[in-house]
C-alpha cells in the first residue's frame, strides 16, 4: 500500500500539556511519527511524499478566520512581552457570554483553542499544513484508482473543529480527505477507530 508521509511533521514539537492540573510534556511528539513510519516501512509499504495541494482543501473545511489565526498566531504571540514559547490559551468565551470576535492574540487564542493539548509552536502551522496535504494526497490516490492509501498524518486532525483546535489537532485531516473525495463522490463513509467520537464528521 502507498503511505503518504511528510517529514515536516518534525517541525511540530509541543512541550506544554496539562493533565489533572499538572503541567507535563505533551505526548504528541515527533517520535510518534518516527515510530509509525518505521512500522509501515518494516511491513514493506511504499512511502511517498505528498504534493502541495494548496489552500483549497483546508478552506473547504475550516473558516477563514481560523486558518488566519493558525498561520499567524505564533508570530503574534511572540510579540507579547514575556510571552511563553508556545501559544497556550488562558481565557475562553463561554455559552451565554456576549462576545464579538476578538482582535488581540490572547482573545483569539481563547476563541480558537479548545484545550491545552494543542499549543502552537514555531513549526506547528507548517507541520499541520503538510499533514493536511498528506490526507488530501491519499484521498487523491484513491480517486485515481488505488484500492487503498494511508496518510500518516502528524499532527493528527480528527478532533479539530471548523474554527477550533482541540485534542492535539489543528486541521481536521479526516474531514479534509472526505471533502476532497466529495469533489467526485456524493457520499463518503468515515470509519472512526478512535475510542471516542471524532469531531467535524457531520459536514
Question: Each PLM stretch: what is its role?
Answer:
Residues 1-191, 196-201:
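HDAC/HDAC-like amidohydrolase catalytic core signature
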